[in-house]
Amino acid sequence: MLRIVPRNIFILFIIAYRKIISPMYGPVCKYYPSCSEYCQNSIANNGVFLGAAYTFMRLVRCNPWSKGGVDMPRVSTKYRVNKFGFASRKNV
């Protein structure tokens, strides 16, 4: 339970960014999923620190010289993303 709370707090900020700031720029990301969606899924599946590290590596790859394409985040076996985009523990 305590591991899910920090994830969902960060995910709440990402959702706010995607709803408020991201529409001002339009769809400019050359990767699928977009960098903010990648960050949201990465933090939900892997935790705040590891998810932030994966997101940082993704942002470094997102530059004018990259080709883009499909780049899915790594998926955890312990957590899942619910229909609202927040992390919850998988029922084993």
UniProtKB/Swiss-Prot annotation:
Keyword terms: Cell membrane, Membrane
GO cellular component: plasma membrane
Topological category with respect to the lipid bilayer: Peripheral membrane protein
HAMAP family listed in its UniProt record: UPF0161_YidD
Job of this protein: Could be involved in insertion of integral membrane proteins into the membrane.
Annotated family: Belongs to the UPF0161 family.
Name under which the protein is recorded: Putative membrane protein insertion efficiency factor
